[in-house]
Amino acid sequence: MTTWSSLGHTAKVLEERRDDYGDPAEQFRAIADRWSITLGTPITPSQVALCMIDLKLARLAYDPGHVDSIVDVIGYAALLREVR
């Protein structure tokens, strides 16, 4: 997959996720609220995105060519400004 096709595919996935789950800012806020309870410390929506990127990077260390994980890293990074 080329750089441009990866970006185009990621944009499509983000649109599909928005259709399936709604506004990313609301979803990341809801996740942050749940993680804050679970972890006993305040978590921000940006931290959720960064943690999800880190999870995907850990998986990519095992399989650097896994396309879904690459797309997810790009997608979470793209959402960082939106979910702040």
For the regions a language model picked out, list residue spans one by one.
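Intrinsically disordered, low-complexity regulatory regions
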Residues: 1-84
